From Swiss-Prot:
Cell compartment(s), UniProt: Postsynaptic cell membrane; Cell membrane
Signal sequence, start to end: 1-23
Family per record: Belongs to the ligand-gated ion channel (TC 1.A.9) family. Acetylcholine receptor (TC 1.A.9.1) subfamily. Beta-1/CHRNB1 sub-subfamily.
GO cellular component entries: acetylcholine-gated channel complex; neuromuscular junction; plasma membrane; postsynaptic specialization membrane
Transmembrane segments: 245-269, 277-295, 311-332, 470-488
Name recorded for this polypeptide: Acetylcholine receptor subunit beta
Catalytic activity: K(+)(in) = K(+)(out); Na(+)(in) = Na(+)(out)
Subunit structure: Pentamer of two alpha chains, and one each of the beta, delta, and gamma (in immature muscle) or epsilon (in mature muscle) chains. The muscle heteropentamer composed of alpha-1, beta-1, delta, epsilon subunits interacts with the alpha-conotoxin ImII.
SUPFAM superfamilies: Neurotransmitter-gated ion-channel transmembrane pore, Nicotinic receptor ligand binding domain-like
Alphabetic keyword roster: Cell membrane, Disulfide bond, Glycoprotein, Ion channel, Ion transport, Ligand-gated ion channel, Membrane, Phosphoprotein, Postsynaptic cell membrane, Receptor, Signal, Synapse, Transmembrane, Transmembrane helix, Transport
Region feature (Disordered): 362-382
Glycosylation sites: N164
Gene name for this UniProt entry: Chrnb1
Amino acid sequence: MALGALLLLLGVLGTPLAPGARGSEAEGQLIKKLFSNYDSSVRPAREVGDRVGVSIGLTLAQLISLNEKDEEMSTKVYLDLEWTDYRLSWDPAEHDGIDSLRITAESVWLPDVVLLNNNDGNFDVALDINVVVSFEGSVRWQPPGLYRSSCSIQVTYFPFDWQNCTMVFSSYSYDSSEVSLKTGLDPEGEERQEVYIHEGTFIENGQWEIIHKPSRLIQLPGDQRGGKEGHHEEVIFYLIIRRKPLFYLVNVIAPCILITLLAIFVFYLPPDAGEKMGLSIFALLTLTVFLLLLADKVPETSLAVPIIIKYLMFTMVLVTFSVILSVVVLNLHHRSPHTHQMPFWVRQIFIHKLPPYLGLKRPKPERDQLPEPHHSLSPRSGWGRGTDEYFIRKPPSDFLFPKLNRFQPESSAPDLRRFIDGPTRAVGLPQELREVISSISYMARQLQEQEDHDALKEDWQFVAMVVDRLFLWTFIVFTSVGTLVIFLDATYHLPPPEPFP
């Protein structure tokens, strides 16, 4: 048994190690050698006055959202930090050809690059992944991050707006005399002065379209963050984005236009229908609800008024005036000769001159045509012949019932009363017949007064119709011109063709 165990042990020791095992052992020995005297808190500069160059790149994975109310942009990104640490260099030939190592981020010096304009107090990255160290001493770190950065929103042309949001990265504790920043590098080693977007993995936002994505290195004149004096460098990544307005066109602007059309056609609704005021107030309340719903989407700022709010206020003013003017039209429609006397200028303008220009034409009253009698009655008494002659040759209906002529003086109008009250010898009628004719004259006067009353009332109703039609065309013109002026102004608000003109 002892001999067998000895032979087994010799066989195990004599078996060659797998290449992976030798590699792991070589990596362990290399890491142990590199970090034997390594201090992660010491800046990797050969001399005190040397600057450590750090390149900062940004890969955008997703533009999550832009909260206009809180002026906050949420993004999912990958930072791309690269610098040189001379203490982490080696000769691959001396270490089984190992040319790179994966080391935990806590083990090496980091340039403490943070997002300065964060909006939630989280300056750091989301996950401290390993750094990749090459044999030349180049260190590359690509941590992912979910950032909420502040973004000043320009609301003037909302929802036809574009925004310029920035992400400002800098070394928080080192100034430019210790750490030199520059924009990220592309695979060829050239500076990439823009945000990198991988087309295969990028998730497009449904509300915003990225127009430009440049980056720029700036140097602040003096320490603006407090502490010791010195210059600080910052790498700023710009996201110039344009809103896709389809959602607001369908859900806000189109309903507002339809409600405005309802308010316009209030003036086409006859006053007798009794729904003019109800329809106007309904449109006004609906616009108020739209304004309240939109208030949650717009930033609470007094610097500018969004164009969509301007349009809603313009529409609300029109609808408010439609309510007021509907009251005016109803007041005109229900006037009568007992309460109001129509001025001469009102009659001239709204009855005679203005209607043809508005497409209105008042129908002419039809005159009753009475056939002339073709037979004569035989006289039966002495006075019957005179009576027969009177009824056969009766005056025309215009004499018994004078047509309404509101421009003719009352004294000049023919009147049956003067015919009755005239000299008896001119008529030669008995007293009984005169009493009958007097009664007929009284009824004629009553019918004439009623006809005058109805005619004057119809005049007021026609004036109300003309005013209604005038308001209809006025509102159509104002609504069309106002809508075009407001929204055509937004068509000229386009993102710049170049990010830095």
